């Protein structure tokens, strides 16, 4: 993702852009900022930014009259949002190495892409206000944006990027100036990024005939820029990636798994901030271009020749026909359905932009409008709207939704997703109601060192019922409980097989419980192989107990596949996990739903900690009780300091 939105707070929030940004990277060579947006037009703000006018807007005042634009800001009030658009490195290299015409076209392509995204954001801008005792979300009549284009990174590599500073004041339909409801741009940074990159590609392809590599997560580099050139001019990226690698390594060590896409995005944001160097002063853009050319020549003639020859390869290509539009919608829906049970319309726009062919050559404004129309059409014809019903007679926004519904609250899904979830729920109902729980273990292990919760959970794991649900918080003795249950099943001559989210976790599960175990993926794959039956070790007899460890991490589709296999082979299933620990990689959430709606046993006594207070505190922390931090602080368990000091202390 290369569009990031940063919240700007405090009285000095605007000074960085007028006093420090123009000379922080280059010696006065950066262009002045300019105004953008219908909100700016309402204030008479056009063309080049006057620093005093910009500071007035960021202070929440009309630059002409000095009057407050709505409620006066407090000392720490949010003043605006910096949406930073950063071009792929190959585009910046193309700018750095091009002649005047090439540089002009690259800059225009970048600017048109930024403006197209800002136009999309403006059309979706809202404000919140109280009306008749209710908080409502109404359309804003424009936004006020200060646009500042820059050409280098903090390490003085070529890096074409733009700071679009969106003021936290928007005009409402009644003429008042109110706060921007920024939830959309904050939540949908990935949508802004996908739109920017799709538009940048179409503009550069249209203007210069540029060809592209295959996009990854919606981002693509120019095809004929060699990797060694990209690496040479990516010092800042290397800094961030090195820091990100350290963070991911610690994440894996602490949690025993890879971060999800959302978790990785958060780690990347932290890495960007942690690795940020002091801003340099110094050379002019002309001087830097000479240096950049020398660095390219030092890589060899091949890299120089590649840069000079990457123009004009894709000229003459056209737009998107109806058949391509259908394929785009299918691809976007498939991508969303893999990872989410429901999504917002903006997320659909994001996926459509990400899968837009790199050969498209329509104008960026036309492309953005097309993607929005395609998303609207898909939402009305191919999805089910599961948002809260609108009250009768409620006024509607431009998007056709009631003003009582926040823009971020609308939820869409597909019939197939709902059907899959409903089938799992029905399967769970049938499985739990079929046979009464087997309770002999309660007597057998009454003196075996287990607490009552563990005894109950072990009894459930060894029952004759077709489905059992066990909630096991960290440190609550889950492994001991399962080992006891497995021993009892073996003693009765009953088959048992364990599955875990990773091969390493499955190996630990097998070692600590004494049962055969593998990954859920492996078990499913063995029974879905098109050309051979399952391997003997996976050909489990009827009555086998399948223990699914860390069931909260299992994707819904995989649980549904397991349910079908269990019915087909007459297996019983025990789902064990903690929905408050790990989330599914992919579309999940069914384990959490099942334990809320079906009979479940919960291990409620923590054994991992030596002190009783910490056992209780860990359960409060798991439940999300913020007041438990007071207990940790009172016990001297909270420590602070710089990042370096904290690492040293650990």
Where are these regions (language model features)?
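Intrinsically disordered, flexible peripheral segments
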Residues: 1-339, 344-353, 369-372, 384-394
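Pre-P-loop entry segment of helicase/translocase ATPase cores
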Residues: 380-459, 464, 530
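Conserved helicase motor core of P-loop NTPases
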Residues: 423, 431-439, 443, 456-460, ...
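Short hydrophobic/aromatic beta-strand immediately N-terminal to the Walker A/P-loop
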Residues: 468-471
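P-loop (Walker A) phosphate-binding loop of NTP-binding proteins
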Residues: 473-474, 501
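Conserved glycine(s) of the Walker
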Residues: 477
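Hydrophobic positions on the alpha1 helix immediately C-terminal to the Walker A/P-loop
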Residues: 481, 485
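Conserved P-loop NTPase motor core of helicases/translocases
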Residues: 491, 495-565, 593, 604-607, ...
């Amino acid at each position: 993702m290369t569009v990031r939105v940063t919240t700007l707070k405090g009285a000095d929030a605007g000074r960085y852009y007028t006093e420090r940004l123009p000379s922080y990277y280059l010696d006065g060579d950066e262009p002045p900022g300019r105004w953008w947006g219908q909100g700016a037009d309402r204030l008479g703000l056009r063309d080049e930014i006057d620093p005093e006018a910009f500071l007035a807007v960021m202070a929440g005042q009309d630059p002409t009259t000095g009057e407050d634009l709505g409620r006066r800001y407090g000392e720490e009030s949010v003043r605006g949002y910096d949406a930073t658009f950063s071009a792929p490195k190959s585009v910046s290299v193309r700018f750095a190495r091009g002649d005047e015409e090439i540089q002009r076209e690259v800059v225009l392509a970048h600017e048109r892409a930024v403006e197209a995204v800002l136009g999309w954001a403006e059309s979706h801008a809202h404000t919140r206000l109280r009306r008749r005792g209710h908080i409502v979300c109404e359309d804003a009549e424009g936004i006020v944006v200060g646009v500042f284009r820059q050409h280098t990174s903090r390490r003085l590599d070529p890096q074409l990027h733009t700071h679009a500073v969106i003021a936290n004041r928007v005009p409402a339909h009644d003429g008042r100036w109110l706060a921007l409801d920024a939830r959309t741009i904050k939540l949908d940074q990935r949508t802004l990024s996908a739109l920017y990159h799709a538009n940048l590609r179409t503009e550069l392809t249209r203007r210069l005939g540029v060809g592209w590599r295959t996009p990854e997560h919606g981002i693509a580099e120019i095809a004929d820029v060699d990797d060694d050139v990209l690496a040479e001019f990516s010092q800042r990226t290397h800094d961030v990636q090195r820091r990100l690698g350290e963070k991911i390594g610690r994440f894996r060590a602490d949690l025993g798994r890879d971060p999800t896409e959302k978790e990785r995005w958060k780690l990347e944001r932290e890495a960007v901030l942690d690795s940020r160097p002091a801003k340099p002063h110094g050379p002019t853009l002309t001087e830097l271009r000479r240096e950049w050319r020398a660095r390219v020549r030092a890589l060899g003639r091949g890299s120089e020749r590649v840069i000079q020859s990457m123009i004009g390869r894709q000229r003459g290509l056209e737009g998107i026909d109806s058949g391509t539009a259908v394929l785009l919608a299918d691809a976007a829906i498939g991508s969303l359905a893999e990872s989410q049970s429901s999504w917002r319309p903006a997320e659909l726009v994001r996926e459509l932009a990400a899968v837009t062919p790199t050969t498209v050559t329509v104008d960026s404004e036309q492309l953005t409008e097309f993607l929005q129309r395609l998303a609207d059409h898909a939402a009305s014809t191919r999805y089910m709207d599961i948002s809260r019903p609108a009250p009768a007679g409620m006024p509607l926004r431009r998007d056709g939704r009631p003003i009582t519904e926040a823009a971020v609250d609308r939820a869409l899904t597909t019939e197939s997703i709902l059907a899959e979830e409903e089938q799992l729920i029905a399967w769970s109902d049938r499985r739990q109601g079929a046979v009464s729980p087997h309770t002999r273990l309660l007597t057998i292990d009454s003196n075996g060192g287990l607490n009552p919760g563990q005894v109950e959970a072990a009894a459930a794991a060894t029952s004759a019922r077709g489905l059992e649900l066990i909630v096991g918080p960290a440190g609550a003795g889950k492994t001991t409980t399962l080992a006891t249950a497995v021993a009892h099943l073996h003693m009765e001559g009953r088959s048992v097989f364990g599955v875990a989210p990773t091969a390493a976790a499955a190996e630990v599960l097998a070692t600590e419980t004494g049962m055969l175990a593998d990954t859920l993926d492996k078990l499913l794959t063995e029974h879905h192989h098109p050309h051979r039956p399952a391997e003997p070790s996976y050909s489990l007899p009827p009555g086998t107990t399948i223990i699914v460890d860390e069931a909260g991490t299992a994707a819904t589709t995989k649980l549904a596949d397991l349910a079908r296999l269990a019915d087909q082979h007459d297996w019983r299933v025990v789902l064990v996990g903690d929905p408050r620990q790990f989330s599914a990689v992919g579309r999940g959430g069914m384990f959490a739903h099942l334990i809320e709606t079906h009979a479940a046993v919960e291990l409620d006594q923590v054994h991992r900690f030596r002190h009783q207070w910490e056992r209780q505190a860990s359960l409060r922390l798991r439940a999300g009780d913020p007041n438990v931090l007071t207990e940790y602080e009172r016990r001297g368990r909270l420590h602070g300091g710089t990042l370096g000091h904290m690492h040293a202390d650990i």
